[in-house]
Amino acid sequence: MHLSLLKAKIHRATVTHSELNYEGSIAIDGLLLEATGIREFEQVHIWDVTNGARFSTYAIRAEQGSGIISLNGGAARHVQVGDLIIVAAFASMSEDQAKTFKPNLVYVDAHNAISHTNHSIPTQAA
């Protein structure tokens, strides 16, 4: 059996651009792609924390160090500049691989610069 596990996420990134007339995708600062291990053209899920929208698209590289998070094409209809989003990628793996797998979790500040990284999410308490 194969499981689909969270491979990587960019947590609470701020949308900097929304380009309806650009080819569909999400342009992500190259530093964030490298930190997460998300590859260009890889499918990603977008969860808009601000308005609750959830959809998928593919990642393309934006200028390294630019802080750009740009939703393009049809995806631009789901967000507004200034919205907070989570970008997530998943990987399929065997149960044995899943036992030792650790996701790349990248947390960003208000300018989409990396504030810290982790490989686990703290246990949620009441």
UniProtKB/Swiss-Prot annotation:
Pathway: Cofactor biosynthesis; (R)-pantothenate biosynthesis; beta-alanine from L-aspartate: step 1/1. The active site is at 25 (schiff-base intermediate with substrate), 58 (proton donor). Pfam families: Asp_decarbox. Is synthesized initially as an inactive proenzyme, which is activated by self-cleavage at a specific serine bond to produce a beta-subunit with a hydroxyl group at its C-terminus and an alpha-subunit with a pyruvoyl group at its N-terminus. Substrate binds at residues 57, 73-75. Its cofactor is pyruvate. GO terms for cellular component: cytosol. GO terms for biological process: alanine biosynthetic process; pantothenate biosynthetic process. Keywords: Autocatalytic cleavage, Cytoplasm, Decarboxylase, Lyase, Pantothenate biosynthesis, Pyruvate, Schiff base, Zymogen. The modification Pyruvic acid (Ser) is found at residue 25. It is found in: Cytoplasm. It catalyses: L-aspartate + H(+) = beta-alanine + CO2. Binds 1 pyruvoyl group covalently per subunit. GO terms for molecular function: aspartate 1-decarboxylase activity. It is an enzyme of class 4 (lyase). InterPro entries: Asp_de-COase-like_dom_sf, Asp_decarbox. Its EC number is 4.1.1.11. Belongs to the PanD family. Heterooctamer of four alpha and four beta subunits. Catalyzes the pyruvoyl-dependent decarboxylation of aspartate to produce beta-alanine. This is Aspartate 1-decarboxylase. It comes from Xanthomonas campestris pv. campestris (strain ATCC 33913 / DSM 3586 / NCPPB 528 / LMG 568 / P 25). The gene is panD.
